[in-house]
Amino acid sequence: GLQMIEATSCGGVVIFRGKLLVLYKNYRNKYEGWVLPKGTVEPGEDFKQTALREVHEETGVAASIIKYIGKSQYTFNTPQDTIEKTVHWYLMMADSYYSKPQREEYFVDSGYYKFYEAYHLLKFSNEKQILEKAYNEYLDLKKANLWGNRKYF
């Protein structure tokens, strides 16, 4: 029968000047669409390190972590196994609008979008939920004049 395999990934919702970073992935014709940057935890890494590394590897962006947002969980099947995936998400701040999608990771486009645009672009509903949660955290920090004040964090 199918084996159940647990997998852990980490990713980031990256914001610069109120806009959110999303990536267009075209994965070997298996699926394509707009996604948030994320990837698998490597041996010896903590979740924050994974999230920062994956954001940098997939987008070229060097971001800073502001806070933990939460996790999304979902299951998918491969011919051999059932994969139970947990993704830990961090709210991050970039220092410019620069991004460069990494083609070797199947990313063909990237950019910073206003919240409602990014929300509608995203392919997966669990990523839409995380985007909304992260954006609301950002708005709260901004309202309290804490966004961009790195000393506070």
Regions found by a protein language model. Name each.
Residues Y27, I66, G70, E105, ...:
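Residue-level detector of alpha-helical recognition elements and their boundaries
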Residues G1-M4, Y152:
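Short, low-complexity, intrinsically disordered N-terminal peptides in bacterial proteins
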Residues V41-Q129:
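Unchanged
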Residues Q3-L36:
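N-terminal strand-loop-strand
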Residues K123-F153:
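Charged phosphate-binding loop/patch that engages nucleotide di/tri-phosphates or the phosphate backbone
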Residues G11, K19-L21, F47-K48, Y68, ...:
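A generic structural signal for ordered secondary structure
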